[in-house]
Amino acid sequence: MPPKTSGKAAKKAGKAQKNITKTDKKKKRRRKESYAIYIYKVLKQVHPDTGISSKAMSIMNSFVNDIFERIAAEASRLAHYNKRSTITSREIQTAVRLLLPGELAKHAVSEGTKAVTKYTSSK
C-alpha cells in the first residue's frame, strides 16, 4: 500500500503536477526552412521594381527544392555507377548537364564554376 499523505501534502503534489503540465503544453515554434530570401535577392537583381506574391514565392520555393533533389539524386546515381563514395563538384556538374536543357545547362555550369572558384579563393 502506498504511504498516506496529509491533505496539504496531497494538494502540493497536485499543484506541482499542474505546473509541469502547463510548461509542457507550450510548443516550441519550429522554424520553416525556405529559399525565399535568396529568391527575393535574385528577383531584385534582375527586376528591382518587381515584387512577388506569397503564393508565387511558395511555387518558386517548391521549384528550387525539386531541382536540388533531382540534381542530388542524379549526382548520387553517377557516383554509384562509377563506384565512388563521394559526390564531388564533377558529379554535380554532370548531373546539371544531364538534367537541364541546352543553353540553360551551359549557364548553370558556368555560374556554378564561378561560385565554387569564389568560395575556394575566399578560404
UniProtKB/Swiss-Prot annotation:
PROSITE patterns: HISTONE_H2B. GO terms for molecular function: DNA binding; protein heterodimerization activity; protein-containing complex binding; structural constituent of chromatin. Its main location: nucleus. It comes from the Eukaryota. Keywords: Chromosome, DNA-binding, Glycoprotein, Isopeptide bond, Methylation, Nucleosome core, Nucleus, Ubl conjugation. Glycans are attached at residue 110. The modification N-methylproline is found at residue 2. It is found in: Nucleus; Chromosome. The nucleosome is a histone octamer containing two molecules each of H2A, H2B, H3 and H4 assembled in one H3-H4 heterotetramer and two H2A-H2B heterodimers. The octamer wraps approximately 147 bp of DNA. Core component of nucleosome. Nucleosomes wrap and compact DNA into chromatin, limiting DNA accessibility to the cellular machineries which require DNA as a template. Histones thereby play a central role in transcription regulation, DNA repair, DNA replication and chromosomal stability. DNA accessibility is regulated via a complex set of post-translational modifications of histones, also called histone code, and nucleosome remodeling. This is Histone H2B. It comes from Drosophila yakuba.
